[in-house]
């Protein structure tokens, strides 16, 4: 567990938006949204969430940690797949309620649990009044079924 804490969000809007103190604004669930892009080419890789512990561990280790809302657990990105995200730069938006990580992905250079480089591999369209998804043709860079298989009992 990290010992790093974050100061309370300042009530002064100018201090929040222009000041030099990082005081992330966590939502009522204790999370902040994180947008992740490739540090070299800018490709959008994923959107995730961090709680205070994940954020502190990311700052302290330089490896991205997130909070899994579906598993309700801390998640070190790449721990199972080997596709760790080395943080090159972290930015916050004007009111400090969202973060942007620029990362170098290690391992297979894949970010998505499907084995693809990006979680954004489908385009959204509208055909005959219905939402459609079209795969962009990107192929998995590793065998996700093998990598994430459950051990047999």
Curated annotation (Swiss-Prot):
It holds the Pfam family PRA-CH. Its cofactor is Mg(2+); Zn(2+). Its EC number is 3.5.4.19. Pathway: Amino-acid biosynthesis; L-histidine biosynthesis; L-histidine from 5-phospho-alpha-D-ribose 1-diphosphate: step 3/9. SUPFAM superfamilies: HisI-like. Zn(2+) binds at residues 94, 112, 119. It comes from the Bacteria. The keyword Hydrolase applies. It is an enzyme of class 3 (hydrolase). It is found in: Cytoplasm. Keywords: Amino-acid biosynthesis, Cytoplasm, Histidine biosynthesis, Hydrolase, Magnesium, Metal-binding, Zinc. Mg(2+) binds at residues 93, 95, 97. PANTHER family: HISTIDINE BIOSYNTHESIS BIFUNCTIONAL PROTEIN (PTHR42945), HISTIDINE BIOSYNTHESIS BIFUNCTIONAL PROTEIN HIS7 (PTHR42945:SF1). This is Phosphoribosyl-AMP cyclohydrolase. It comes from Mesorhizobium japonicum (strain LMG 29417 / CECT 9101 / MAFF 303099) (Mesorhizobium loti (strain MAFF 303099)). The lineage of its organism: Bacteria, Pseudomonadati, Pseudomonadota, Alphaproteobacteria, Hyphomicrobiales.
